Amino acid sequence: MKNFILLAVSSILLVDLLPTHFEHNVDLSRAINVNGVSFNNVDTSSLGAQQVRQSASRGRGLGEKPKEGADKEKKKEKGKEKEEEPKKPNENKLKQPNEGQPQAQGDGANAGQPQAQGDGANAGQPQAQGDGANAGQPQAQGDGANAGQPQAQGDGANAGQPQAQGDGANAGQPQAQGDGANAGQPQAQGDGANAGQPQAQGDGANAGQPQAQGDGANAGQPQAQGDGANAGQPQAQGDGANVPRQGRNGGGAPAGGNEGNKQAGKGQGQNNQGANAPNEKVVNDYLHKIRSSVTTEWTPCSVTCGNGVRIRRKAHAGNKKAEDLTMDDLEVEACVMDKCAGIFNVVSNSLGLVILLVLALFN
């Protein structure tokens, strides 16, 4: 009796190891195939990544310590080289004209003013050029008036100064008329710039004013170009044109925005029915085994682990004989069972078989 039990158990283990066709899903090739644990496929490409590089200059082998004398000599040589290197003399930087600094020269040029050009003065702006007065700038020299400065000379008026000389009026006085600008005064007329005043008319620039008309640049505005360009307004061109921010704000709409992304995820997240579609041969084999037991209910999965199929009769073939069933009379569905144990199943069965054999032989 004892030997019969041992023989029965050992035979069960052997059957479990070998591939059979008795509806037991044991594939020896799959069981032996170890996913991700293949000792035959060894990547040897990284074996030479950690080669030890010896120093050719010193020629010392691995594990040797560098000689202290050699290190000291090298340190001394490096120290001598550093001492022998002549110190580079400090180069004097070229004196550049400081923007925003007085002492600007030119016809109505106001030092430190950015790029304002025109016949009118660029009031309160650096590097303003023109024949008009430069309102609110110190020590400007030229034909334009030095606005806000006491010793301004030229044809323009000295804006805001009592001792202004030239043809222009003394800036800071109401109703001044002439070639000089009446800085800080309303209704000033003439060739000079009316610094900081609205509705100024004439050849002078209307410093910092939006409605300036004439040949003078609207001072206080960067990048003004042309006669009477409104300086400080970006891209303003023309006589007294105060045109801010024109022509370059286009292209705000993204071209072809998000088109093609509407269908980017189409087909994603869906079941991969093409890959998991049941094989016709597998279905036929399974049907041949359980043809007599197929009903309108789903049959058990054809495998005990992994991917398999299950079938059932369609409604119109419910009363049809089992021998007459075809693929058109059946509904087939893929089924997924728990993942097969693989190598662990083989090892456990092998250990069990060895134990049984030992017990059978020594008892």
Swiss-Prot record:
Sequence repeats lie at residues 98-109, 110-121, 122-133, 134-145, 146-157, 158-169, 170-181, 182-193, 194-205, 206-217, 218-229, 230-241. During host cell invasion, proteolytically cleaved at the cell membrane in the region I by a papain-like cysteine protease of parasite origin. Cleavage is triggered by the sporozoite contact with highly sulfated heparan sulfate proteoglycans (HSPGs) present on the host hepatocyte cell surface. Cleavage exposes the TSP type-1 (TSR) domain and is required for productive invasion of host hepatocytes but not for adhesion to the host cell membrane. Cleavage is dispensable for sporozoite development in the oocyst, motility and for traversal of host and vector cells. O-glycosylated; maybe by POFUT2. Residues 1-22 form the signal peptide. It is found in: Cell membrane; Cytoplasm. A lipid is attached at residue 340 (GPI-anchor amidated cysteine). It is a lipid-anchor; GPI-anchor. Gene3D superfamilies: Thrombospondin type-1 (TSP1) repeat. Residues 341-363 form a propeptide. Glycans are attached at residue 304. Essential sporozoite protein. In the mosquito vector, required for sporozoite development in the oocyst, migration through the vector hemolymph and entry into the vector salivary glands. In the vertebrate host, required for sporozoite migration through the host dermis and infection of host hepatocytes. Binds to highly sulfated heparan sulfate proteoglycans (HSPGs) on the surface of host hepatocytes. This is Circumsporozoite protein. It comes from Plasmodium knowlesi (strain H). The gene is CSP.
